[in-house]
């Protein structure tokens, strides 16, 4: 018996050791060293072809990028389960998409769901699988030849190959990579790999300067030309190792590409543009060539948005062709009124430059209420676009992509992601908590076609003029004339119901003073002459459909606290407003648009966008007149209104944290807790002080509620992609 137990134990240990060697280290023995690899996908000139029914057929990428975010979770939680993926895959294919792009190895639930969804399906979904590069590695002292960059990228790339072939187990992983048992072979639906992230230009430049002699690579599958830079030689090695590994272990090949974007695009712009935008590096995959052992092919992958960086808007149109080094026809890149479509022109430059297929693997616009950048020519902005406008912009972008001669593109992104951050709101929020609330001011959270709206099945309020969801329990303060203010809130908005008998909307001006912090505020408004029962930090002014806005006391203006030098040229910390200053200001966001500064670098301040200006409309997604950017609506004697938390200087409503006084010992934005705010209702011209009532606030911590909703943009893109115009 003892011998039997020992034998069984030994066998189990051997099996475990074999499992670890094969599924965790990538070890293999090439049993068919002379076998030629096969491929079902290849490039032919600037097109991609798939082999179907024994014939090569042209394939155009109609793709969607998919992230890992869910409300209440960070990207690194990998919280999306198999059933959710299956539901999403069906919705994506019903929209007319044929490809999903992911950025890194996801949890095993994704691959199990992908396998199950495609099984027996005549028209499957295809996958573009990515390999991520750690953000710290790209933004540190390391160069691209550091083992933590180059070798780690190689290791992750080979691991990715095992994952899609169902031959890997990952129990402990980096935070940018999922884990699990990867036992499903989905390789028959993986058309290609996209290696890397958006390259940091300083890392590329640093690598090239540090290793000028390492600008050549000669491999079995890839080699560099004489014009290659060291960073490109590093990429060639990574790609060569990928092709060699998959060809030897699995006798297969598929397409490959390296991530790129405008910041490191291959063009040499005029000196003034290069200097102004500090463009210090290029990555050109034309310097990486394939040997005759490559049966699949290489494509050029770009993240390209209409508004970023939009270099061509600063280059004279007569010089556009010179960037490609050949004559390029841009005649269809001008509107009838002469306005250039610099996005289409840029895409045309890319296809003119490259000899391989060009795939725009990221393009999109955001439905967030906030904005970070305006598109100068086409109006496809980074933020503050309605869901309908988003859909129209996506269709226009895809048309530009195809008319420029690209092999397709992938929309960014499938779902909204609450954990995301944006450079022009990062100063205003607690970035350790943004996964637990929906910040409508942060545009980066709202690029998705799928929204996660607050509430388990529906939101607590829809601003549409129907006040049936309001009750007496919501009343904060009421007045002798029957007027009242009621409030609710959820993970995205503070909602207000303003009731006033005999309301003459648009003919009288209503004012709501709001007191959020005891550190600042004023009981008197210099501009209106109104007096308040408490020191108000904000003033909500309702003048009608076109001229209603939220104002902030100048001392509590978050833009000034972080960007006054950029916008006004003044340092307000040297001479801050008084704590009880009676001045109220409009609320603005700083933008990245550079036109004014580029034209007159010495005199122009940064451009801003009035985010406190309120938009009238119906915010109920169930209604035909739905406007996702609508802030308020009037019906009879009632006004319904919603304000995003950050607009009222909440840094983390999940724990009810707001901004402290910027100037009293903080020298910047710090956070303090609050348990209530005060609100009142008055009108321009009244002489008596406006009484204010208290409204209790209680955070929800890490427990969030949300429900999925397909945006209007989904329907618009679906009609385009399935209606015969999606190519």
Locate predicted features:
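Aromatic-lined substrate-binding rim segments of carbohydrate-active enzymes
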Residues: 81-153, 158-159, 238-254, 336, ...
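Surface-exposed, glycine/proline- and aromatic-rich loop segments on solvent-exposed faces
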Residues: 476-597, 655-684
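Active-site-adjacent substrate/metal-binding segments within catalytic domains
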Residues: 28-119
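Glycoside hydrolase catalytic-domain groove-lining segments
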Residues: 256, 278-377
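Active-site groove signature of glycoside hydrolases
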Residues: 134-139, 143-146, 157-229, 250-262
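N-terminal Sec-pathway targeting helices
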Residues: 1-16
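Aromatic-rich peripheral "rim/lid" segments of glycoside hydrolase catalytic domains that contact
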Residues: 371-380, 386-389, 400-476, 710-727
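Short, well-ordered beta-strand segments enriched in hydrophobic/aromatic residues
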Residues: 465, 492-501, 637-645
């Amino acid at each position: 018996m003892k011998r039997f137990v020992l034998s069984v134990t030994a066998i189990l240990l051997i099996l475990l050791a074999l499992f670890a060697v094969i599924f965790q280290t990538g070890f293999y023995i090439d049993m068919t060293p002379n076998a030629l690899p096969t491929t079902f996908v290849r490039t032919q000139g600037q097109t991609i072809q798939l082999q179907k029914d024994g014939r090569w057929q042209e394939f155009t990428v109609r793709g969607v990028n998919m992230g890992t975010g869910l409300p209440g979770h960070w990207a690194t939680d990998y919280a999306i389960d198999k059933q959710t993926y299956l539901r999403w895959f069906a919705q994506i294919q019903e929209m007319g998409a044929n490809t999903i792009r992911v950025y890194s190895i996801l949890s095993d639930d994704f691959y199990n769901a992908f396998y199950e969804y495609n099984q027996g399906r005549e028209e499957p979904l295809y996958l573009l699988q990515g390999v991520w590069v750690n953000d710290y590695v790209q933004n540190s002292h390391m160069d691209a030849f550091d083992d933590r960059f180059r070798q780690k990228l190689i290791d992750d790339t080979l691991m990715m190959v095992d994952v899609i072939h169902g031959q890997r187990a990952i129990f402990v992983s980096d935070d940018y990579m999922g884990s699990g048992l990867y036992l499903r072979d989905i390789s028959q639906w993986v058309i290609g790999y996209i290696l890397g992230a958006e390259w940091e230009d300083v890392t590329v430049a640093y690598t090239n300067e540090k290793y000028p002699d390492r600008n050549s690579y000669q491999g079995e599958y890839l080699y560099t030309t004489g014009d290659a830079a060291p960073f490109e030689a590093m990429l060639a090695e990574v790609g060569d190792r990928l092709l060699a590994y998959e060809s030897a272990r699995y006798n297969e090949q598929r397409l490959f590409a390296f991530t790129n974007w405008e910041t490191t695009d291959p063009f040499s712009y005029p000196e003034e543009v290069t200097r102004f935008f500090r463009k210090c590096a290029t990555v050109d995959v034309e310097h990486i060539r394939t040997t005759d052992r490559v049966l699949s092919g290489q494509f050029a992958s770009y993240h390209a948005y209409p508004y970023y960086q939009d270099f061509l808007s600063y280059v004279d149109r007569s010089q556009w062709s010179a960037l490609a080094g050949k004559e390029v026809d841009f005649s269809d890149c001008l509107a009838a009124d002469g306005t250039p479509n610099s996005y289409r022109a840029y895409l045309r430059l890319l296809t003119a430059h490259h000899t391989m297929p060009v795939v725009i693997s990221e393009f999109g616009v955001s439905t967030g209420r906030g904005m970070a950048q305006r598109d100068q020519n086409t109006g496809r902005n980074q933020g503050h676009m309605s869901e309908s406008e988003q859909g129209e912009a996506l269709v226009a972008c895809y048309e530009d992509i195809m008319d420029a001669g690209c092999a397709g593109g992938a929309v960014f992104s499938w779902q909204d992601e609450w954990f995301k951050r944006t450079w022009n709101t990062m100063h205003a929020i607690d970035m350790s908590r943004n996964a637990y609330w929906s910040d409508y001011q942060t545009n980066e959270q709202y690029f998705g076609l799928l929204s996660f709206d607050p509430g388990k099945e529906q939101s607590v309020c829809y601003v549409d003029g129907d006040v049936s969801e309001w009750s007496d329990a919501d009343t904060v303060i009421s007045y002798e004339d029957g007027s009242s203010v009621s409030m609710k809130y959820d993970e995205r908005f503070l909602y207000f119901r303003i009731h006033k008998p005999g309301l003459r909307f648009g003919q009288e001006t209503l004012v709501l003073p709001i007191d959020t912090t005891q550190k600042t505020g004023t009981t008197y408004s210099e501009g209106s002459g109104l007096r308040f029962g408490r020191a108000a930090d904000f003033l909500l002014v309702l003048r009608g459909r076109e001229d209603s806005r939220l104002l902030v006391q100048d001392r509590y203006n978050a833009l000034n606290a972080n960007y006054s030098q950029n916008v006004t040229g003044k340092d307000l910390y040297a001479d801050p407003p008084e704590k009880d200053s009676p001045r109220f200001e409009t609320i603005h966001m700083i933008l990245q648009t550079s036109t004014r500064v580029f034209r007159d670098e010495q005199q122009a301040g940064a451009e801003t966008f009035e985010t406190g200006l309120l938009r009238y409309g119906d915010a109920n997604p169930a209604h035909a007149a739905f406007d996702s950017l609508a802030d308020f609506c009037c019906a009879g004697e009632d006004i319904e209104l919603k304000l995003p938390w950050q607009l009222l200087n909440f840094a983390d409503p999940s724990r009810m944290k707001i901004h402290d006084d910027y100037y009293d010992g903080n020298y910047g934005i710090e956070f303090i807790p609050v348990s209530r705010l005060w609100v009142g209702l008055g009108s321009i011209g009244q002489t008596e002080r406006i009484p204010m009532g208290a409204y209790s606030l209680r955070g929800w911590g890490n427990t969030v509620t949300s429900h999925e909703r397909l945006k209007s943009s989904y329907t618009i893109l679906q009609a385009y992609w399935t209606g015969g115009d999606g190519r």
